[in-house]
Structures are given as C-alpha cells and as structure tokens.
Amino acid sequence: MQIKARQFAREHSLFSCIQCGKCTGGCPVNLKTELNIRELMYHVLVAGKKFEVDDIEVLWDCTTCNTCTDRCPKEVNPMEVVIGLRSAVVEGGRAVPGTAKVALQSVFNQGNPLTFSSEDRAQWVGDLEVRLLSDEPGAEYLYYVGCTPCYDPRIQPISRALVRMFGQAGVDYGILGTEEGCCGSEVRRLGEEGLFEMLVEDNMEIWEERGVKKLVTTSPHCYNVFIKDYPQNGFEALHYTQLVAQLLEEGRLTFTGELAKTVTYHDPCYLGKHNQIFDAPRSILQRIPGLKFVEMDRSREKSLCCEGGGGRMWLEGTNIEERLAHQRIDEALGVGAEILATACPFCVLTLEDAVKIRGLEDKIQVADIMELLTQVT
C-alpha cells in the first residue's frame, strides 16, 4: 500500500520537522522496540511522490501516549502521523494485526471491542438503582460508563463505586444502558476512521434524543475522544476525577473512615499528557484521611506510559518480553508505596497484570481512585 507522500507531509505539517530527535528521544516504546518516529517522518519526507506503508510492523507499537507531540519544538504532531499511517494501511484494504482485528470486528457487530453482546452492556448495574435515560431523559449528567467498565469483571466495581458516590452526593445523573455505544477512541487510533465516524454519528444521535448536555466518563480515553475528536455541539465532558474533586470541594461527599496506607499515583497518559489533568486526582487522594501520598520521580508530564493506549490493549507489539508496566511497578515500590493508584481502566489492568506476573501481590496493590474512595465514604 502506497500513500501520496507529499500530500501526507503537508496534511501533517511534516515540512516543519527539523529532525531534532526530541520525539524519539522521549518515546517510551523506543526503549524496547525499533519504533523511531523521527526516522519514520524522515522517510516520508524524502520518499518523493509515493511512500510504502504495508511492511512497517513497528507502526503498531505506538501507544499514542503523546510524549512525542509534547516534546516537539515545531508543533508537529508525530502521534497523529502514526495514526494517519495506520489509517492509510486500513483504507488500503490491509487488516490491522493480531487480536486488534477481532476487537474492531466486535465493535462493528456488538458495539464493544470485548466480543460481548450489546444486550449485556448494563449487567454491571446489578441490584443498584440507576436511572435509565431511555425512561427518564434530561438528567444533568450522562454517566458514560465505557466498554471496559461495562464488561470487564475487574473494572466493573469502579463503575458501581461511581454510581454509589453519585447517589451519596445527590448528583442528578443517568445512564444509557444498552443504548450506550463504544466511544471509538481506540478504533480511531487503530486507523479505522470509517468505523469511528459511524460511532460518532450514532452516539451523538442518541445523546440528542436523551437530552444529554453534560457527560462524565470512567475512562480518560473516552473523555479525550469526546472533547478532541467529536463535533462540539453544545455538550460538556468531564472525567470522573474532575467531578469528584469538585464534589469534595463543595462538601457534598463526607468521609466515614480512614485509609492508613502509603499511596502513589500513576498519571494515565490520556488524562495527564493529553489533557493536563494532574491536580484533580491528587487532590482527591490527599483528602483521604490517614493516607500518606508519595510522588514518583516520573510523574505528571514525565509519567511513564503503561503501554495500554493506541489500541495496544489488543496488540502485543514487537517486544512482549519487556513491558513498561513492570518498570512502573518498580518505580512505585521504590518510593515505598503500598498502593499504586490510578484513574484509568486500561492502566489498572496493565499495572495489575505486571504485579501478578512478578508475584508481587504481597508487596503492592493497584487500585483505581474510586476503589480507594469507596473504602472511606
């Protein structure tokens, strides 16, 4: 599959690239694979009229963490270059590799990448009393749960904790239940632009029907795609940490216990590097009675990617022996943390998997912030 190199370079501002190497120098995946985004952009620039994209296996190693874009002094977006090249591969009729193909097919057929039935999307609710917007539209907030929080047994407790907290704080909210569709974040980042556009159209249509003006998400990936890649037709999106921090500030949530643990925080890339939401999660943790908060050296803008973004939850990549999540666990242990907290379903899964693989369950626990809050409220 060939792309029109000059047109692609213009569309992605590649003629501004000065080949300084800051993108590759900061790329966490470059430490373990042959992905070199500076070199990749150079080859597009010097390709002449056509550039061959079929055989670039490392193209699928990128986690879209945004470090390269943050570091670029010329305001080029190398991450979008990767997504654009992936899109060219898909549009050219080539399938994405590995289990990502299954995930994309599942999104098309069932509205989620996890191969579960769309009819089971609201089973996470269990016996909780939750308002369905199909029955009672017009709530102040749509709680957009997301695919992984709806279906994954490890993540479902986070969704349930949020619902209980909404009730305690008197938040006027509702869910879409089986009407909720995939946000499309990873679909777009795997290069399936056509499917992504279909999801956007379907989601915005149901939001309009249900009177959605504000929505709050479990996942930073959903939050990011809603504010960056969806048409901004009068709706406001929040990540749950923003809303919870606000509720605590307003005194609408009260603590009934304490958590006498040493806790550090892992910044999810799509909350931190992509959207500069660093303070809200920390303010929540630092309010918990008894909790001792410690910071890792690689935090905030310098946070190490867990390797779950950009569709990598469904792609092993070219080097499965070395995992960034294992490094992150070492960093958390290095500052004496008993709990590694985060605020992203993908981060919870990758980091907890690293703990289990290394047999460190008796040394450190991985938890979402909501799982800690539910212990003390």
Model-derived regions, located:
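A broadly conserved sequence feature marking short terminus-proximal activation segments
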Residues: C17-M41, K273-Q276
